[in-house]
Every structure is written in C-alpha cells, then in structure tokens.
C-alpha cells in the first residue's frame, strides 16, 4: 500500500539506521500473528477438555479467527491507504493484544470464540499494512531485497516456533497462557512502533472511501472463507448448503 512517510533516517548502516530497527519491530508484530495461527492448534485438546467443546464446536476456536482474518484483509489494506498504514497497524496491534487477553481470560465457549473473532480482526489490520510499510521504508532495490528477506524468514519460521511455544506453555502453565503471553509482547511492539516506525499520511477518508463497495467485498470474502472452513469442510463441495453459500459470495463480489 502506498503512503507518504516521514524520513525514517539517513544512516545507511543497518546497526544505526532507524529503518532497520523499525523493520525488526514490524517483523515482531508479524511474528505474533504467525505464531497465533499455529500455537492454538497444540492447545486444542486442553481447551476442549477445560471448556467442554464438542468436536465440531472446537473447530470454531480456529475458524472464528480465520473467517475474520481472511475476510477483512482487503478492507484493512484499503484503510491503510485512507488513514495511514502506521495508524492502522497500531490500531490492529492494540485490538489483537486486548482480544488476546480476553481469549486467555475466557471461561466459556462463547467468550473464547467471540474473542478469537476479534483477534482475527486485529490480525488482519496488522498484517495487511506490514508489507507495504516495509516496501515504503526501503525504496532502494538492494536494501529492499534484504528487508524482504528478513521479513520472509520471520514469517516462514513463525509456524514452527508457534508449535513449540504452544506445547511448552500448555504443558508448563495452561492453555490460557498461549493467549496471555501476547499482552506484554504487544505492549512492547506498540511502544517501539510509535518510536521507530515512521508515521504515514493516508489520502483521507473523504477522498477514497467507498462504503457500499467495502461492505459488499468484506461480506463476500467473509462468506467465502466461512464456506471453505465450515460447510465445505463438513459436508463437501457437492452439498447444496456449500454451493449456495459459495454462489452468494460470488454474487456479492
């Protein structure tokens, strides 16, 4: 996403250039999102035992996050263009952190699934603008390639780290801690983002907002993701319910 930025620094040495610090902060934020996608899988048996989920209900601990995350990525990226990428990143990170605490404190099925849905919203807002911010901070091709390499390594390795972290936290503490641990990390990343990541200026809500289009596209994407994770997975693609949901999703697009 293209945005106007303040100068992130002039020193070209990675050790002293503020841009490289900003890159590490953005990668840390992205790592939180990647970890969350895998850390929950390890804790599902403990969550099911503690909260009494049925097998089909347990799937929504994962699916609630996927539906909101996948459905809102596009509109979150557009919000970055309108309001400024850093502003959307910070708002998404705050929402993700608060909802992580809500997940960790959840005492029933409804509270956990609802908090997971909100977590997906925050994850979408943070993820959608991260790559564009990195590209904007590193316009020179050689530096941009290095920055993208660091970002790609963090994103690809986060899944393995999440599986390990999920197992350790669940075994040594409880499943609640796979969510609560996001709180201190989120606070630190939020503070460092405000300090090191350059502020961005969006084009303005009044110049580029298409409310009806945003509602239709977001509804279509969320319905499409829901179709994949629910009726298609449970009933198959040949089921009437799956086909109707998929058709409505296409019509909304």
Located regions from the model:
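Hydrophobic transmembrane-helix bundles of small-molecule transporters
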Residues: 171-253
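Transmembrane-helix bundle of Major Facilitator Superfamily
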Residues: 2-195
């Amino acid at each position: 996403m293209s945005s106007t930025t303040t100068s992130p620094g002039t020193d070209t040495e990675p050790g002293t250039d503020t841009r490289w610090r900003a890159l590490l902060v953005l990668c840390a934020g992205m790592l939180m999102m990647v970890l969350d996608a895998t850390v929950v899988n390890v804790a599902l048996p403990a969550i099911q035992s503690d909260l009494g989920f049925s097998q089909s209900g347990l799937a929504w601990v994962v699916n609630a996050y996927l539906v909101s995350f996948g459905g809102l990525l596009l509109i979150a990226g557009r919000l970055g263009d309108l309001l400024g990428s850093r502003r959307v990143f910070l708002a998404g990170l705050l929402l993700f952190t608060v909802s992580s605490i809500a997940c960790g404190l959840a005492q029933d099925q409804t509270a956990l699934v609802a908090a997971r849905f909100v977590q997906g919203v925050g994850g979408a807002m943070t993820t959608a603008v991260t790559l564009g911010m990195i590209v904007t901070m590193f316009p020179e091709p050689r530096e941009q390639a290095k920055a993208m390499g660091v970002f790609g390594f963090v994103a690809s390795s986060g899944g393995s780290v999440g599986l390990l972290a999920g197992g350790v936290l669940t075994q040594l503490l409880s499943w609640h801690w796979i969510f609560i641990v996001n709180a201190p990390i989120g606070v630190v990343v939020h503070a460092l983002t405000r300090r090191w990541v350059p502020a961005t200026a969006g084009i303005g809500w009044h110049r580029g907002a298409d409310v009806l289009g945003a509602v239709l596209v977001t509804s279509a994407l969320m319905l499409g993701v829901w179709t994949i994770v629910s009726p298609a997975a449970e009933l198959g693609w040949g089921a009437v319910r799956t086909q109707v949901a998929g058709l409505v999703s296409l019509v909304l697009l």
